[in-house]
Regions:
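ATP-binding glycine-rich phosphate-binding loop
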Residues: 72-125
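Catalytic activation segment of kinase domains across protein kinase-like and atypical kinase folds
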Residues: 271-356
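Conserved kinase catalytic-core helix
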Residues: 152-153, 238-268, 272, 278-282
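Conserved structural core of kinase catalytic domains
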Residues: 164-244
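Short coil/turn segments at secondary-structure boundaries
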Residues: 117, 130, 134, 178-182, ...
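Arg/Lys-rich, intrinsically disordered low-complexity tails that mediate electrostatic binding
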Residues: 1-49, 54
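ATP-binding glycine-rich loop module of kinase domains
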Residues: 112-174
Length: 453
């Protein structure tokens, strides 16, 4: 209904004292003349909407209380894999950038790329992720790394604690947006487009094509543990381990995983910079129990959760299928120039993403052992590693009894060292445990987070 006009008129009138101005007002007939505002009676729809809003606030508050009860620090639980699904659900699988409170560059641009740390906050609960970017078109293609990461999430993450989760694949809107991010200390989220899974497929045809045109424009969002150090930091003297045996426990966690997946997985870029160490809580340890091939258990206490990162060169069970699909949309020159050279036989440095190699991932053991930074490794066998970045495969276990020839030999050597140390060590009652983790390799790991009890 149209409102009547509101106007002010002015006319003069005579008085005994002279002429005065008289104001008259014609107002909207629907407007009340009293000072009290008209109160609108709530409708059923308004009451229902208000009730829904209050329920949403109440549910969010309850979710925060529940999360803080079972996991005061999200990073600790994510490291263990404890309550991980609840945390991901609460933060909308980390794909909603409206929940990001802040972003910052971690380190400088290197040959490996550049990384942003994203801090997510919702109702006084915080968690972190990292956005990994390529440094140039020749760097390892992040579309393939995303595919490997999703495969690891599906096949291995419930069984082994040493892996990080991959959250999502993104693409910059254009080359300039990528260049701006490369030069900036903060991230502009409006320049990123999420590439969702469609019809059960991790990536689609358009993504394959884009990855061969300009691989720089893709980036991946992964799990992040704030405050981690790398094994490389320890080797360079920037950080120190809690005791001499820790290095043996760290290597055991890595090679136990590699042993169990050796037929279907090879990392192909396993060095000290790609092994992260997370100490969940100062002064507390994690009690690990691992089931060996003979059914026996081996146990030890460590201050660290170990994480293996950078999956851009890995061999996985579906690598051959990926390569065949890639060949349908990318020419050989693009495959070589856009970060896919590891699919070419025989492969540089004995790297071939199409086939496993049970010796190649000894690179980590070789570098750590020969660094002379860890006294606890001095008595362990050396390994056969023919060049700095790779080695040919030795399939036969214990082929050279005085040397380690493959990851099975390596795990056996580390197991023997831990068992011998356990016999000679004196048990103390003062150790405070933060969690118990039991790993069998053929069943989901069992996690007991003592702080949640």
């Amino acid at each position: 209904m149209a409102r009547k006009s509101f106007r002010v008129t002015m006319r003069k009138r005579k008085t005994s004292g002279g002429t005065k101005e008289k104001f008259t007002r014609k107002t909207n007939t629907n407007v009340r003349t009293n000072t009290k505002a008209k109160t609108k009676t709530p409708t059923a729809e308004m009451r229902a909407r208000h009730k829904q809003q209050m329920k949403k606030v109440s549910d969010e508050a309850a979710a925060v209380i529940a999360l803080k009860t079972i996991c005061a620090d999200s990073g600790v639980c994510i490291a263990f894999g404890y309550a991980q699904d609840k945390i991901k659900t609460y933060f909308k699988r980390f794909l909603d950038f409206r929940l990001v409170q802040s972003s910052r560059r971690i380190g400088e641009v290197s040959v490996n790329g550049f990384v942003f740390e994203l801090a997510y906050k919702r109702k006084h609960y915080t968690s972190y992720a990292v956005l990994k970017n390529s440094a140039n078109q020749g760097a390892d293609n992040l579309v393939y790394e995303y595919v490997v990461g999703k495969y690891i999430d599906l096949e291995y993450s419930k069984y082994f604690p040493c892996l990080i989760e991959t959250y999502g694949l993104f693409r910059y809107t254009n080359v300039q947006a990528y260049e701006n991010a490369k030069q900036s200390s903060k991230l502009e989220f409006k320049s990123l487009v999420h590439i969702p899974e469609r019809n059960g497929a991790v990536i689609d045809v358009d993504t394959f094509k884009w990855s061969c045109i300009d691989s720089r424009q893709h980036c991946i969002l992964t799990q992040h543990l704030k405050g981690v150090i790398s094994l490389g930091d320890v080797m360079s003297g920037k950080a120190r381990l809690k005791n001499e045996m820790e290095i043996v426990y760290i290597l055991f966690q890595v090679y136990y995983f590699l042993f169990h997946v050796r037929k279907d997985f090879t990392h192909y870029d396993l060095h000290e910079g790609n092994v992260l160490l997370f100490e969940p809580e100062k002064g507390k340890k994690i009690k690990y129990k691992y089931k060996l091939s003979d059914g026996k258990l081996i146990s030890f206490e460590s201050a660290y959760v170990v994480k293996i990162i950078d999956y851009g060169r890995c061999h996985i069970k579906m690598s051959d299928k990926f390569y065949k699909t890639l060949g349908m949309y990318c020419n050989p020159n693009q495959i070589n120039s856009q970060g896919y050279p590891w699919f070419n036989k025989p492969g540089m440095y004995h790297i071939n993403a199409l086939e496993p190699n049970v010796s190649h991932d000894l690179r980590l053991y070789s570098r750590v052992k020969t660094s002379n930074a860890f006294p606890a490794l001095q008595t362990l066998k050396p390994c056969i590693y023919t060049c700095e970045f790779g080695t040919s495969e030795i399939q036969t276990n214990n082929k050279y009894p005085q040397y380690i020839g493959n990851i099975t030999d390596c795990l056996n050597e580390l197991t023997t060292t831990i068992q011998q140390n356990s016999k000679g060590s004196i048990k103390t009652q003062n150790t405070i445990h933060l969690a118990h983790i039991q790993v069998s390799g053929d069943a989901p790991m069992r996690i007991r987070y003592l702080k949640a009890e």
